[in-house]
């Protein structure tokens, strides 16, 4: 599947290429791209790691599961996600909008991506109007998934 792209300058092209890695699909259209933490800015990556240490501890102690997982953060549901109508659009500043369908679900996410010398890193993801970074920070500060 070839995503539709808007006209982009060099920095925007690098941001788009990063997002394309996250939403890569196989021949049937199923998601098999990278997880975003691999491309997270160092501070964001540290926040993710700290939050997952807490999440893992909660799950081991209580058997409860937290509703935080990278595939959910990227707009993928349970199981196999079949991506269609992928559109990647650079917005103003560091934002890149990603829209796609997964079955009957329509997803609209924004990635905060900064680039230096065409090396780009993800600072945050806005999914369903919520900052993923802030959700992880809340887990760290409260030591809970609530």
Report the location of each language-model feature.
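N-terminal signal peptide c-region/cleavage motif recognized by signal peptidases
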Residues: 3-5
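Sec/Tat-exported extracytoplasmic proteins
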Residues: 23-30, 40-56
């Amino acid at each position: 599947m070839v995503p539709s792209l808007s006209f982009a300058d060099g920095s925007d092209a690098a941001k788009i290429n990063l997002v394309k890695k996250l939403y890569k699909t196989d021949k049937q259209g199923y998601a098999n791209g990278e997880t975003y933490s691999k491309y997270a800015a160092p501070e964001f990556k540290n926040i993710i790691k700290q939050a997952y240490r807490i999440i893992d501890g909660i799950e081991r102690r209580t058997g409860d599961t937290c509703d935080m997982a990278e595939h959910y953060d990227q707009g993928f549901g349970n199981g196999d996600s079949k991506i269609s109508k992928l559109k990647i659009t650079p917005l103003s500043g560091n934002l890149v909008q990603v829209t796609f369908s997964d079955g009957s679900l329509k997803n609209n996410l924004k990635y905060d991506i900064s680039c230096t010398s065409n090396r780009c890193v993800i600072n945050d993801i806005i999914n369903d109007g919520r900052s993923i970074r802030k959700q992880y920070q809340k887990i760290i500060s409260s030591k809970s998934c609530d």
